[in-house]
Structure formats: structure tokens, C-alpha cells
A protein has these predicted regions:
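Acidic phosphotransfer microenvironment of two-component signaling modules
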Residues: 8-11, 59, 92
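Non-catalytic, surface beta->alpha helical segment in thiol-disulfide oxidoreductase systems
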Residues: 75-103
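Structural signal for short hydrophobic segments within the conserved structured cores
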Residues: 2, 51, 82-85
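Structural micro-motif
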Residues: 65-74
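Short acidic-hydrophobic, aromatic-tinged amphipathic segments that line or gate anion-handling sites
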Residues: 1-9
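Thiol-based oxidoreductase modules, predominantly thioredoxin-like and allied folds used
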Residues: 4, 23, 39-42, 46-60
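Chalcogenol-based redox active-site neighborhoods
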Residues: 33-37, 56, 64-65, 91, ...
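Local sequence-structure signature of Cys/Sec-based thiol-disulfide redox active-site neighborhoods
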Residues: 8-41
Length: 103
């Protein structure tokens, strides 16, 4: 999973047809297993790029994208947010979204 280093990099990458971002902090104990589960989950969708953003490193991301808790997983399609899951992540909802995009 590639790590985003700047808000501009995020803006550029979010323009893809579909992309996934996970916002987390370096001290978040919940973020580690959720990130691992997301990576395993996304192995079924290798064509969809996945990125991680550490809020300490990209402060602007938290404010501009209204990230109030971590972990937060956000799906973007051509620069528009289409799904957001925070804290209690519903992987079934994410799978339904990806099935729609696959068809």
C-alpha cells in the first residue's frame, strides 16, 4: 500500500476511476488490524489502487476531508467521494459497492 505524502498527491490520485484511501495515525492501535484486513480484502480487486494517509504527515487532509476519527476508509471515483466508513468498518457495504463497479 502506497503512502501519500502531500494533499496535492491525494488530489491527483483521487481522480482515478476508483481509488481507496485509509486515513490513520501512527499511534492508532485499531488502525493496524483494519489496514491489514483492508489489504486482504482488496486483493480480490487488484485493479483498484489503495493508499494510506497518516494524518500527522498530511495535516491538510484531515481538515479538507473532514476526518474526525481513525481509521477512516474513503472510496473516491473521479475526484468525488462515493463511500466513507469510519471506526466500525462495514466490509460488506464496501463489497457491494465494488460489485457495482465491477459490473
Amino acid at each position: 500500500m502506497q503512502t501519500i505524502q502531500s494533499y496535492q498527491e491525494f488530489l491527483d490520485l483521487s481522480q482515478a476511476p476508483l481509488s481507496v484511501f485509509i486515513a490513520k495515525t501512527k499511534m492508532c492501535s485499531v488502525c493496524v488490524p483494519i489496514s491489514a484486513k483492508l489489504e486482504t480484502f482488496m486483493k480480490d480487486y487488484p485493479e483498484i489502487p489503495m493508499y494510506q494517509i497518516y494524518l500527522e504527515d498530511v495535516l491538510e487532509f484531515q481538515g479538507q476531508q473532514l476526518i474526525f476519527t481513525v481509521p477512516t476508509i474513503v472510496f473516491f471515483s473521479e475526484g468525488k467521494e462515493i463511500l466513507r466508513e469510519s471506526r466500525f468498518i462495514d466490509f460488506d457495504k464496501m463489497e457491494r459497492l465494488l460489485e457495482i463497479y465491477q459490473s
